[in-house]
Amino acid sequence: MQKALSFLKPYSLLAGIALILMLTELAVELMQPLLIAKIIDDGILKQDLRHVWIWGTVMIGLTVLSFAAGMLNSFYAAHVSQSFSYDTRKGLFQKIQSFSYSTFGQFSSSSYITRLTNDVTQVQNMIFMSLRFMLRAPLMIAGGIVLSLAVNVKLGFFLLVTIPILILFLLWVLRKGGALFRSVQKRLDQVNTIMQENLIAIKLIKALLRGSHEVKRFIKANTRLMEKTVSAFQLVEFTMPVLMLLMNLCILLILWAGSYSITSGSTQVGDVVAIINYATRITGALSMFPFLIMIFTRAKASGDRIGEVLETEGDEREEGTISDRLSGRIEFQHVSFRYPEMDREALRNVSFSAKPRETIAILGATGSGKSTLFQLIPRLYQPDSGRIYIDEKPVQDIPAEGLRRQIGYVPQEVLLFSGTIKENIAWGKENASLDEIMDAAKLAQIHETILKLPNGYDTVLGQRGVNLSGGQKQRISIARALIRKPAILLLDDSTSALDLQTEAKLLEAISTYHCTTLIITQKITTAMKADQILLLEDGELIEKGTHSELLSESQLYKRIYESQFGREGSESC
C-alpha cells in the first residue's frame, strides 16, 4: 500500500489544501450546536429576539463559508485522486514494460489488467474519500466528544464511554474485511482470465461448439466471485445495525440524564440540545464507517497488489546504441536453459555458429526448444550456462536496447494491433516513411495484396487482424520486422500459412537482404534452401549440416523428408 501511495507525493500541496478546506468545513459544523444552544438559552428562552437574529445571522454566514469550503474541497480532492490514478497507471505500465519474459510470467495477463484498472480505481476512490469524508468522520467523532465534555462533563461522559467500544468493534471489522476483500480481488482475477481467454479464442469456441462448456466455466468462476463478495459485504453491512443500536441507546441515556439535570436546575436546555446534536452528528459520522471500511479494505487489498508489481525486481534497462551495424555473426557455445519453475531444461548443451548473411533453418518437433533458442538471441531470456556471442562479443556485454534495434523478430503467434495496415507495419520503426513501409511490404510479398484492399494501406484492421487471412497476417508481421532493416532476422515458423510459391518469393527476396536469417520451419522445401540446417530434439542439437549432408547422414532428417516427399523423393536425391 505504501508503495502505491508514493505516487501521491507530487500532489502533497494540493492534498494539504483539500485537507485545510475539509477542516474548515468540519470546524463550522462543530460550532453549529454551540450556536444553536446560544439561540435557545439566550434568545428563545429569554424571549430576546435580538440574540436570535445575531446568532442566526452568524450561523447563516458560517453555513455559506462551509458550503464554499466543501465545493473547493471536492474540486481539489477530485484533482488529486484523478492525477494519482493517471500517474499510477503510467508507472505500473512502464514497470511492466521493463520486465523480462521470466519476470513478466510471475503474474497472469488478466492479473496485470485487473491491477492496472480495478485496483488503481479502488485506491483512487479511497484517496478521494479520504480527502472528502474518510478523515472528516473520525475528526467529527473526536471533536464532538471534546466539545460535548466542554459543554457538560456529565452528559458528555456517555459519549466518551460509548464511542471507544464502537471503535474497537470497527477495528475488528476492518481486519476481518481486509482478508475477505483480498480474496474477492483474487476471484476477480480468475473471472477476468476466463473472459480474456474466451474473447481471444471466440472463433475456436464457436467452431468446436464449446460455447455451453465455456458458459458453465464462467458461471462457476462468477458464482465463486459473487459468494465471496456477498460474504465481504455482509460483514460490512452487519456493522450498521450494531452502530445504530449502541448510539441510539447512548442518546436515550443523554435525554434521560439531561431531563433530570434540567429539572434540578444544574443544566440548561441549550446544553442538552447541543450534546444531543453532537450525538446525532457523531452517529452520522459512524454510519459512514461501514461504507468507509469497505472502501479502505478494498483499497488496502488493491494497494498491496499494486505494490507487488512495483516491488518486483525489474530488469536493468540497458539503454544505448551500437555504434556500428552488426555483421550478424552468431555463435552458441554449450548453451543450456531452463524456464523458471520448470524441472526439465528447454535447451541442453547447444552449440552452433552462423556466419554473416547466412540462412539457418531450424527443424524439430513441438517442444524441442526451437522458439526458446530464438528468445535467447535478443536477450529476452538469459542462458543458465554456456555463452552466446554476437559478432564475437558476449551477448550480455551488448546493450539490450542497441541489440534489439538490429534484430527483426517475428514470433510464432502473429499479433497485429488495432489500427491501419500502414500503422502496423510502421510499428516496427518509429517515424517510418510511406516509401519505407511500401518497400518492406514488397519484400514481404504483401504489397500487391494491400493495394487490392478498398483503402489500401489505410485499411483498418479488426481486433488482432481478424479481417485478414493467416498468410496475410504473417506477411504483415514479416514486413514489420523487415522495416527495421535488421542485421539479424528471426522467423519463428512465420511462413507456415503461406503457399509454396509465395513462400519461395519471400525467401528469395530475403536472401538478397543484407542480414543473417534464422527460420524455424516444418517444411523441408524451406529448409533445403538454407545454408545450414539445425535439427533439434528434446532441447538438444542432434544434427547440423546442409540438406544433402543431413539427407545422407541423419536418419531423423531422412524420415522427416520422406514424410513430406515420400521414399522416392529421398532416393532420387
Swiss-Prot record:
GO terms for cellular component: plasma membrane. GO terms for molecular function: ABC-type transporter activity; ATP binding; ATP hydrolysis activity; ATPase-coupled transmembrane transporter activity. It is a multi-pass membrane protein. SUPFAM superfamilies: ABC transporter transmembrane region, P-loop containing nucleoside triphosphate hydrolases. Keywords: ATP-binding, Cell membrane, Membrane, Nucleotide-binding, Transmembrane, Transmembrane helix, Transport. Gene3D superfamilies: ABC transporter type 1, transmembrane domain, P-loop containing nucleotide triphosphate hydrolases. It is found in: Cell membrane. The chain crosses the membrane at residues 17-37, 52-72, 127-147, 153-173, 238-258, 275-295. PROSITE patterns: ABC_TM1F (PS50929), ABC_TRANSPORTER_1 (PS00211), ABC_TRANSPORTER_2 (PS50893). InterPro entries: AAA+_ATPase, ABC1_TM_dom, ABC1_TM_sf, ABC_transporter-like_ATP-bd, ABC_transporter-like_CS, P-loop_NTPase, Type_1_exporter. Residues 330-563 form the ABC transporter domain. Belongs to the ABC transporter superfamily. This is Uncharacterized ABC transporter ATP-binding protein YfiB. It comes from Bacillus subtilis (strain 168). The gene is yfiB.
